[in-house]
Design a protein with these regions (language model features):
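N-terminal positive-inside, membrane-proximal cytosolic segments immediately preceding the first
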Residues: 1-38
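Short solvent-exposed coil/turn linkers within tandem alpha-helical repeat scaffolds
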Residues: 31, 79-86, 114-123, 151-160, ...
């Protein structure tokens, strides 16, 4: 009798350290601040609105800094629903619920984020969070479809290469070796400068194939 086949790769698709929510903010805060700084103020009415918005953001940021748990983070969202601190609070809620094993609540927080802030620089990361929760819950087909959605909707985001890598790794876990190899190859060629490309090259090496050469810049 042949020994039972062992998975090529075990464990979570991505280590949490690869997607720390603090890293999301650190990686994108310059873009967020640049967008805010690019707003041109014209007229008293706009200036008054901007002052109100600034005060709202400042108050929301203060409340966020004092938040100690999920209920207090939700209070930031409820009281200041259209502010950047509210977006930050929703991402923290999603992460906290995930860490507590509440995948449905975590996914609900991610989807709430996407509904409220569809153009936010972290929207791709929120959708990738949905995919990771689906994978953790065993809903593999939905996880793969959501990963594809990240790449399609947010191709320029930091989340896109991680989503493509995640899909390939799910295929690898399911012993779909050739499909996984094609997925890793795609990450290397389409996102050559990303950490996911280096991870994909490592997987290709383990599978006995060479990573494709990165395209010339």
């Amino acid at each position: 009798m042949e020994p039972a086949q062992q998975p090529v790769l075990q464990g979570p698709v991505l280590d949490d350290s690869s997607l720390e929510w603090d890293l999301f903010w650190e990686k994108n805060k310059s873009l967020i601040l640049a967008i805010i700084g690019a707003i041109v103020i014209g007229g008293v009415g706009v200036a008054a609105w901007f002052g109100y918005s600034s005060n709202q953001n400042a108050a929301a940021q203060t409340l966020l800094a004092e938040a100690k748990g999920i209920s207090e983070l939700q209070a930031v969202v409820d009281k200041f629903p259209k502010t950047m601190p509210a977006a930050d609070a929703l991402m923290r809620i999603a992460a906290a619920e995930r860490d507590a094993g509440n995948m449905e609540k975590s996914t609900a927080a991610f989807r709430d984020f996407l509904t409220r802030f569809p153009k936010h620089p972290l929207a791709g990361g929120a959708l990738l969070g949905v995919a990771m929760n689906q994978d953790a819950a065993g809903d593999i087909q939905s996880a793969m479809a959501t990963c594809q959605q990240v790449v399609t909707q947010f191709p320029q985001s930091y989340a896109a290469p991680f989503a493509a890598y995640t899909e390939a790794e799910i295929l690898l876990r399911g012993f779909q070796i050739e499909e996984a190899r094609r997925g890793f190859n795609m990450v290397v060629t389409q996102f050559p400068a990303s950490p996911a490309a280096r991870m994909s090259a490592g997987q290709l090496s383990r599978l006995g194939g060479e990573a494709p050469a990165a395209p010339q810049q």
